[in-house]
Amino acid sequence: MIYQERLLKILRSTHISEKTSIILERHNAFSFKVAKYATKTDIKNAINMLFSVKVNTINTMIVAGKSKRKANKIGRCSNWKKAYVVLDKGQKIDFINTVE
């Protein structure tokens, strides 16, 4: 039970950009913002549990936070982790129908 709760906290949100839409069309890969402590096996298990699809490969990367400036103060956004999840052929994640 504790492991399932941990898996639910791993996937933060989907990451949508021009690059991810091109990768989705060409390689059937989805992009997610994930927890920084998540490993590739954790991400794979979380996607299998939530969406019931078979994952082919996963590529992860740490995205550096941007520097933000407001008046004379310089702040910084925190780093975050992004995962590209490539599904097997014929597999598809339907985000609309998975939410109940």
Swiss-Prot record:
A single GO BP annotation from the record?
A: translation
UniProt GO cellular component terms: ribonucleoprotein complex; ribosome
Q: Which domain of life is it from?
A: Bacteria
Q: What are the protein's UniProt keywords?
A: Ribonucleoprotein, Ribosomal protein, RNA-binding, rRNA-binding
> Does the keyword field hold Acetylation?
no
Q: Which Pfam families match?
A: Ribosomal_L23 (PF00276)
Q: Does the keyword Lipid metabolism apply?
A: no
InterPro entries, sorted: Nucleotide-bd_a/b_plait_sf (IPR012677), Ribosomal_uL23-like (IPR013025), Ribosomal_uL23/eL15/eS24_sf (IPR012678)
Provide the disulphide bond pattern. Answer: none
Q: Name one GO molecular function term.
A: structural constituent of ribosome
Protein family (similarity comment)? Belongs to the universal ribosomal protein uL23 family.
Q: How does it assemble?
A: Part of the 50S ribosomal subunit. Contacts protein L29, and trigger factor when it is bound to the ribosome.
- What role is this protein assigned? One of the early assembly proteins it binds 23S rRNA. One of the proteins that surrounds the polypeptide exit tunnel on the outside of the ribosome. Forms the main docking site for trigger factor binding to the ribosome.
Q: What is the protein's name according to its record?
A: Large ribosomal subunit protein uL23
Organism listed in the record: Blochmanniella pennsylvanica (strain BPEN)
Gene designation per UniProt: rplW
